Amino acid sequence: MSDLPPLPAEPLPGRYRHYKGNDYRVEGLVRHSETLEVLVLYRALYGDTSALWVRPRAMFMETVVVDGRIQPRFTRVSNE
């Protein structure tokens, strides 16, 4: 698997706030085993914090429209 391109630099590990207000910790980037799509590995910092989740990097990094305003889906708030 040495012929794989390097993973993107962002998002960096740390605390991010979802546009709906909850905080999450990005643990790192991973690849889908079949498609090699880059996914963001993260966990909620509320409720069950032991569960790990993945979301396509493109979706994690995209913008959303809320009340007519364009904003990031996730915003980095700390290195924590």
Where are these regions (language model features)?
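Mixed-charge, low-complexity intrinsically disordered regions
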Residues: M1-E80
